Amino acid sequence: MAEKAIESVQCFGRKKTAVAVTHCKRGRGLIKINGCPIELVEPEILRFKAVEPILLLGRQRFTGVDMRIRVKGGGHTSQIYAIRQSIAKALVAFYQKYVDEQSKKEIKDILVGYDRTLLVADPRRCEPKKFGGRGARARFQKSYR
């Protein structure tokens, strides 16, 4: 009784302190973020950013896979950027592992050609505040009299 192995990959996306982890497996094209469909992502203005990989690559590439995404940390915008990165990385990893190298290369080229941050994390972090001023670089005004 040989059971078919579950074809799945797990990828993460990061932006500032937000982390999104995507579990990608064979399925019917469901994409859920913290248990809710991707079409109901809030805030509505940033919804297109979350579905960007799907719009770029076409829905047909996502019909054979189910994605479950858990996201935590950061703010609204950072979470959306972490989600889109983890979706893109998970699809590339799934195609590399279970489909073929040619399809994976096509997907990767499309994504990198549009926006490199879909596959590569943004290393910028908030600079810590220093003494003698209100922020990291701003100084208190100097008075001569």
From Swiss-Prot:
Recorded GO MF terms: RNA binding; structural constituent of ribosome
Keyword Ribonucleoprotein carried by entry: yes
Record keywords, A-Z: Cytoplasm, Ribonucleoprotein, Ribosomal protein
One GO BP: maturation of SSU-rRNA from tricistronic rRNA transcript (SSU-rRNA, 5.8S rRNA, LSU-rRNA)
Main subcellular location: cytoplasm
Localisation: Cytoplasm
One Gene Ontology cellular component annotation held by this UniProt entry: cytosolic small ribosomal subunit
Entry-linked PANTHER family: RIBOSOMAL PROTEIN S9 (PTHR21569), SMALL RIBOSOMAL SUBUNIT PROTEIN US9 (PTHR21569:SF44)
Family: Belongs to the universal ribosomal protein uS9 family.
Protein name: Small ribosomal subunit protein uS9
Organism per entry: Gossypium hirsutum (Upland cotton)
Gene name, Swiss-Prot/TrEMBL: RPS16
